[in-house]
């Protein structure tokens, strides 16, 4: 039985990866172009006037945050669009009636989202080499933060797709929630520059912890304790996973 589940998981993974690789011009190229513009405008043009941040050039400071921004956006978008398309076309019903556990279905779609997020992250990192020298303080923290964040936002995208009723619904969360939280997550500034009240308020933003942990992996500096960073990631992943499992298990919004 486990072999059957493994075959099902690999099949979903392969389908999801083939889906975004087949249209790479729409899924991989646009975020790379967008991040390149960020590097040029914020890093080169504005960064040269700002000066150093925690002993690093402004460009070096924002690179980890921009990479994380690309991973968050693309992990989320991949699963949200893919799962909702399967639901809209009623392909998901074939999975629901097949002898495949809900855990395998979730892992398959999330695996596709993580793969796209990591692909975009690697491409953006490669582009950043044209602007700043490559520096890594801890590969372990870079890999852990990147993978856990990609998993979290893939689950968030899945959750959005389960509740969505139209294609417009899957763009509401990225526009009105994800984008503001990302911009206010410390990508372009350090929390230490904020007044005490706004520092405290910023700690309610989960993206702050992810960017801080990822920046530590690259530069060795962080705004929040590392234990807290991984604690927040694990708690959110567990909560989102259980919620997704419960909704799909009950067929919420999936069965006609």
List each language-model region with its residue ranges:
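Aromatic- and glycine-rich beta-strand/loop motifs that create alpha-glucan
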Residues: 1-32
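Membrane-interfacial helix-loop-helix junctions in multi-pass membrane proteins
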Residues: 20, 182-239
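Hydrophobic alpha-helical transmembrane segments of multi-pass membrane transport/permease proteins
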Residues: 22-48, 61-73, 179, 232-239
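Short alpha-helical transmembrane interface motifs in multi-pass membrane proteins
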Residues: 26, 61-65, 72-77, 107-109, ...
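Pore- or pathway-lining transmembrane helices of multi-pass membrane proteins that form conduits
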Residues: 29-33, 166-185
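Hydrophobic alpha-helical transmembrane segments of multi-pass membrane transport proteins
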Residues: 33-38, 58-128, 157, 175-176, ...
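Alpha-helical transmembrane segments and their short interhelical loops
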Residues: 102-174, 221-245
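Short cytosolic juxtamembrane segments of multi-pass membrane proteins
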Residues: 248-256
């Amino acid at each position: 039985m486990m072999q059957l589940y493994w075959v099902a998981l690999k099949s979903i993974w392969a389908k999801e990866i083939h889906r975004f690789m087949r249209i790479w011009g729409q899924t991989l190229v646009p975020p790379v172009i967008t991040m390149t513009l960020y590097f040029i405008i914020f890093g080169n043009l504005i960064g040269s006037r700002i000066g150093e941040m925690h002993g690093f050039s402004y460009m070096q400071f924002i690179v980890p945050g921009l990479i994380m921004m690309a991973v968050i956006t693309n992990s989320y978008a991949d699963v949200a669009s893919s799962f909702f398309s399967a639901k809209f076309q009623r392909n998901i019903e074939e999975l629901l009636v097949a002898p495949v556990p809900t855990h395998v279905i979730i892992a398959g779609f999330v695996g596709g989202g993580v793969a796209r997020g990591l692909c975009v992250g690697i491409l953006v990192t490669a582009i950043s080499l044209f602007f700043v020298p490559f520096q890594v303080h801890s590969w372990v923290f870079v890999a852990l933060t990147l993978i856990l964040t990609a998993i979290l936002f893939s689950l968030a995208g899945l959750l959005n797709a389960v509740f969505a009723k139209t294609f417009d619904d899957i763009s509401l969360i990225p526009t009105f929630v994800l984008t503001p939280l990302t911009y206010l997550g410390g990508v372009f500034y350090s929390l230490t520059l904020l007044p005490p009240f706004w520092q405290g308020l910023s700690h309610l933003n989960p993206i702050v912890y992810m960017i801080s942990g990822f920046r530590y992996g690259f530069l060795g500096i962080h705004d929040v304790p590392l234990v807290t960073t991984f604690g927040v990631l694990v708690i959110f992943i567990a909560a989102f996973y259980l919620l997704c499992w419960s909704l799909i298990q009950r067929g919420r919004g999936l069965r006609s």
